[in-house]
Amino acid sequence: MPIISIDYTFFWQIINFFLLLFIVKKYFKEPISKIINERKQKIEAELVEATKNKKEAEQLLKDAEAQINASRKEATEIVKAAQRKAEEEAHNLIREARENRENILKTTELEITKIKNDAKEELGREVKNLAAELAEKIIKEKVDDAQEISLIDKFIAEVGEDK
């Protein structure tokens, strides 16, 4: 028995096949082509959209990196400005402290000088008062030279004990 035998069923199979091709071509070619074309257009549109989205994403990434770099630069500048300001304030505080110290020293020296001068004036007044008292005692007693010297020594001793 041969593998392919040519008989009347073979003939009908060929006719059925061509008839099926004709029916498929006549009734299904356009809808299938339309579906295939729509699918092809949809895939192409999605590919174009994906390419567009990829470019947008790359641009957004570049923009974000540029913004990050700008922010870092700005942050660095802010830190440097803050450091400069802190250094200036430190120098100003040191300068003010030195000026205050100098003012305090000058004020203290002036006060010491005033106290010293006041003490000298007070001492001068006391010496004048003591001299006046001594002169008064000398006049009251009308003493001779020897008594006057002993009276002065006695008065000086009394003044020394009081102090």
Swiss-Prot record:
GO molecular function: proton-transporting ATP synthase activity, rotational mechanism
Listed InterPro entries: ATP_synth_b/b'su_bac/chlpt, ATP_synth_F0_bsu_bac, ATP_synthase_B_chain
GO CC aspect terms: plasma membrane; proton-transporting ATP synthase complex
Membrane-related topology note: Single-pass membrane protein
Sequence intervals crossing the membrane: 3-23
Alphabetical keyword list: ATP synthesis, Cell inner membrane, Cell membrane, CF(0), Hydrogen ion transport, Ion transport, Membrane, Transmembrane, Transmembrane helix, Transport
Subcellular location(s) per record: Cell inner membrane
A Pfam family annotated for this UniProt entry: ATP-synt_B
PANTHER family: ATP SYNTHASE SUBUNIT B, ATP SYNTHASE SUBUNIT B', CHLOROPLASTIC
Subunit structure: F-type ATPases have 2 components, F(1) - the catalytic core - and F(0) - the membrane proton channel. F(1) has five subunits: alpha(3), beta(3), gamma(1), delta(1), epsilon(1). F(0) has three main subunits: a(1), b(2) and c(10-14). The alpha and beta chains form an alternating ring which encloses part of the gamma chain. F(1) is attached to F(0) by a central stalk formed by the gamma and epsilon chains, while a peripheral stalk is formed by the delta and b chains.
Family: Belongs to the ATPase B chain family.
Described purpose of this protein according to its UniProt entry: F(1)F(0) ATP synthase produces ATP from ADP in the presence of a proton or sodium gradient. F-type ATPases consist of two structural domains, F(1) containing the extramembraneous catalytic core and F(0) containing the membrane proton channel, linked together by a central stalk and a peripheral stalk. During catalysis, ATP synthesis in the catalytic domain of F(1) is coupled via a rotary mechanism of the central stalk subunits to proton translocation. Component of the F(0) channel, it forms part of the peripheral stalk, linking F(1) to F(0).
Name of the protein: ATP synthase subunit b
Gene assigned in the entry: atpF
